[in-house]
A protein has these predicted regions:
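Short, surface-exposed, polar/charged, turn-prone segments marking secondary-structure boundaries
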Residues: 31-32, 50-51, 91-93, 106, ...
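Short, charged juxtamembrane terminal tails flanking transmembrane helices
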Residues: 310-318
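Charged, low-complexity, helix-prone segments enriched in Lys/Glu/Asp/Gln
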Residues: 113-115, 304, 318
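Small-polar-interrupted transmembrane alpha-helices in polytopic inner-membrane proteins
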Residues: 102-120, 168-174, 278
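Flexible domain-boundary/linker segments
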Residues: 24, 40, 44, 79, ...
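Membrane-interface helix-loop-helix regions
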Residues: 1, 5, 10-13, 19, ...
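Alpha-helical transmembrane segments in multi-pass integral membrane proteins
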Residues: 12-21, 87-99, 127-287, 291-306
């Protein structure tokens, strides 16, 4: 679902942007929260252990180095995001923004072929490179999810052709198969580790429900915009919290659970306290941490732009 939303939002952002303004917007969106959250994670980890490996992981995280390993496991998804951003940036730089349907189709077909091969050859070491290593950032495995997001945007713009509908159907079928296969894999590992398994169908149902909610929010955007301002602002804040919450929830959340259970709290009570603590931290990051950093970065970009413009003006006079 994360990548579906990204496909929708990123293509929508690129539609009215130049290549450089798109790049600037992505830097302003990604880096401030990463700098804060990775630093907070490092502080928490340092209470238990700190060594050269952890520092290297931290540096890879704050630079969003796509190869990993990072300070916390979930940063791998940002590597996938950056690869997708690179594709969109290249299209903007080449003046090919009107060909976003072709990008969606390419992602959809590539992902369909890859998932089909993965189903037919589940033990392939070559395919595992693109699912289990840093190379998974290349959008073979997750390309269908990005494609669905792009197709939702195309639907909102009434730009769906017959071939786009074929691409959307491929992406939906492949996406459902991917979720089901991932659920089966998780179930098998749970069976081996804990002695019980579960059906992957609920995961597929949740994914479908998420897609329906995204399509509904785009379809009824005008009606939603007429809701009370206070409600819309609250929803916007909750949306802004999701990014830092995603970056903070695992390492810091687990450490909080350890600390709280060490105080002889029951696991359920520890969880009930850890969740709001991490949510409050996420709110603090998005409301008071990210904005000042973005302001400084904007100032830096503006000054760089002025210098470049000045140099270009001097060269034109020579």
């Amino acid at each position: 679902m994360f990548f579906v939303i990204s496909g929708l939002v990123i293509v929508n952002s690129a539609a009215a942007a130049t290549a450089m303004s798109f790049l600037k917007g992505r830097i302003l969106r990604l880096y401030p929260a990463v700098w804060i959250c990775a630093s907070l994670t490092l502080i928490v980890i340092a209470t238990q252990d700190v060594n050269r490996r952890i520092i290297k992981n931290y540096l890879r995280s704050i630079t969003l180095y796509p190869g990993g390993p990072w300070i916390d496991g979930q940063y791998w998804t940002l590597a996938c995001e950056i690869c997708f951003y690179a594709l969109v940036f290249i299209m903007c730089a080449m003046g090919q923004k009107a060909r976003m349907p072709a990008l969606a189709l390419g992602l959809s077909l590539a992902s369909t072929v890859f998932i089909a091969l993965l189903y037919a050859l589940p033990d392939s070491d070559i395919l595992a490179i693109f699912t289990e290593t840093a190379w998974r950032a290349i959008p073979f495995y997750y390309g269908c999810q990005f494609a669905i997001g792009i197709y939702i945007w195309l639907l909102s713009q009434a730009r769906m052709s017959r071939i786009s509908w074929v691409g959307l159907i491929c992406a939906l079928v492949t996406g459902a198969a991917q979720i089901y296969m991932a659920g089966e894999n998780t179930s098998e590992r749970t069976l081996a580790a804990a002695g019980h398994s579960f059906s992957p169908l609920p995961a597929v149902a949740i994914w479908v429900a998420g897609l329906i909610s995204i399509v509904a929010s785009v379809t009824y955007a005008k009606q939603i915009s007429r809701l009370p301002t206070a409600l819309l602002q609250s929803v916007k804040t909750l949306g802004s919290m999701t990014y830092p919450l995603y970056l903070l929830h695992f390492a810091i959340g687990v450490q909080l659970l350890d600390w709280l259970t060490d105080l002889e709290m029951t696991p359920l009570l520890a969880l009930a306290l850890a969740v709001p603590i991490v949510c409050v931290m996420s709110l603090a990051v998005c409301k008071w941490g990210e904005p000042p950093i973005r302001s400084v970065l904007r100032l830096v970009f503006d000054r760089l732009g002025q210098r470049v413009a000045g140099l270009q003006a001097k060269e034109s006079r020579v």
